[in-house]
């Protein structure tokens, strides 16, 4: 039986996430399953052995004690998505299953661990990070001796960017550490568990590795995907 990778559904460019995992990547032993807050197929969560938490609309500020009014606030939030992805993350964590967070996924993991985000990073930083007609690009630095550094095997590089929120460095979640940051303004670009003892693979990035221009060449896409897939392939259920 094939191991399943569950990708949380987003209404924003979901096809990019599906297409990122090619037939060659998945081989004969892995397959993708869509975990959709619209279908509310919670029964499929327990069928998966790895999860991708995708990008998309802002998380409800009420979940982290944030302000309800701010720049670029969406006209409506998706509380059903927030609840659905909370179930995914809690299941993954309790069963020690690999998780990859992307953009909103990074922010939501920090929130679920008790941390907070900036509701909006401000016009100066938005000029660097917020998508206009196309993704922005900027330089990041990888923190030494982190999981992300061991995966990418580089100290610095260029990533794409399409966000107006970011993790507050003074409000990191429980057991969360920074693994990358923007060179220009210090915005947090990567997180992972600080204490990895008896923890499964968990890596989250603020950029979009699934839609980088040269994703098959970039260590910020190719290496991350390979590491996550390997974590799913080699995962063995822990004694819980």
Put a short name on every predicted segment.
Residues 103:
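Conserved G/P- and acidic residue-centered "switch" motifs that form tight phosphate/ATP-binding loops
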Residues 107:
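Cytosolic ligand/metal-binding cores
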Residues 203-206:
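Active-site-proximal beta-strand elements of phosphoester/diester hydrolases
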Residues 161:
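Short basic/aromatic active-site micro-motif
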């Amino acid at each position: 039986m094939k191991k399943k990778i569950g990708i949380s559904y987003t209404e924003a460019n979901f096809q990019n996430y599906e297409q990122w995992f090619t037939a060659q990547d998945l081989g004969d032993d892995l397959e993708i399953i869509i975990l959709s807050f619209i279908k509310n197929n919670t029964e499929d969560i327990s069928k998966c052995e790895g999860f991708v938490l995708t990008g998309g609309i802002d998380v409800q500020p009420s979940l982290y004690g944030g302000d309800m009014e701010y720049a670029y606030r969406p006209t409506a939030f998706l509380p059903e998505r927030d609840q659905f992805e909370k179930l995914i993350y809690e299941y993954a964590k309790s069963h020690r299953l690999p998780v990859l967070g992307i953009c909103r996924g990074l922010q939501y993991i920090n929130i679920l661990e008790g941390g907070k985000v900036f509701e909006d990073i401000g016009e100066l930083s938005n000029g660097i990070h917020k998508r206009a007609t196309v993704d922005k690009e900027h330089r990041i630095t990888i923190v030494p001796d982190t999981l992300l550094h061991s995966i990418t095997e580089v100290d610095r590089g260029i990533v794409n960017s399409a966000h107006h929120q970011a993790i507050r460095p003074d409000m990191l979640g429980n057991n969360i550490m920074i693994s990358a940051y923007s060179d220009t303004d210090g915005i947090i670009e990567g997180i992972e568990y600080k204490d990895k003892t008896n923890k499964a693979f968990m890596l989250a990035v603020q950029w979009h590795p699934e839609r980088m221009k040269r994703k098959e060449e970039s260590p910020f896409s190719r290496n991350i995907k390979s590491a996550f897939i390997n974590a799913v392939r080699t995962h063995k259920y822990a004694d819980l």
